[in-house]
Design a protein with these regions (language model features):
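RecB-family 4Fe-4S metal-dependent nuclease core
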Residues: 1-181
């Protein structure tokens, strides 16, 4: 990352998982960061520079895919946290229905983060999505709009968040070099 004409900063990290999906001239990118503890994507924390990692990973993944697929338009589909755990379900109600157990486990393992608000992308990410996803932080109201609890971004907002994080990384890098840690 270029901080000035004389100064550059290199970030080193490892993206846990990158999934891609090609459709005609488009390449959709999903980034997943595995976490041992529960983590939600928080735009306020991002604004203050406290939660930049997931967006930095998405920026790096998009850049890598653009270099590898110059003939495709690379589009961020989702950036997600996956809580690695062994979920427990409540079975105090007698003999539980196997489907209820499966649904409870999926709810416990549901990823958090940000997902594209484009219907086509959501369908690619969750083929069973109708009104509420079992794996993504996305649900729709009866009128077809997203619920307030849904974590969705338009492509324009993905770019705004991406640009902001790039700016914030440069700002923080310059502060570190100036001794303002």
């Amino acid at each position: 990352i270029t901080l000035s004409e004389e100064e550059k900063m290199r970030l080193i990290g490892r993206i846990d998982r990158i999934d891609t999906c090609e459709r005609q001239d488009k390449l959709y990118v999903k980034v997943i960061d595995y976490k041992s503890g529960y983590r939600r994507f928080d735009l306020a924390a991002l604004y203050y520079g406290l939660q930049l990692q997931l967006v930095v990973y998405m920026n790096a993944a998009v850049e890598m895919q653009q270099k590898a697929h110059r003939d495709k338009k690379v589009i961020p589909a989702a950036m997600l946290y996956y809580h690695v755990s062994d979920p427990m379900t409540d079975t105090d109600k007698g003999q539980p229905d196997p489907q209820e157990i499966q649904d409870a486990i999926l709810e416990e393992l549901k990823m958090t983060g940000m997902v594209s608000d484009e219907e086509e992308i959501i369908q690619l990410l969750d083929k069973d999505f109708t009104d509420k996803s079992k794996v993504l932080p996305v649900a729709k109201k009866k009128d077809g709009s997203f619920t307030q609890a849904s974590s969705v971004l338009s492509q324009e907002d993905f770019h705004v968040v991406s640009d902001y994080v790039n700016h914030k990384i440069r700002e923080l890098g310059s502060e570190i070099l100036a001794g303002d840690i």
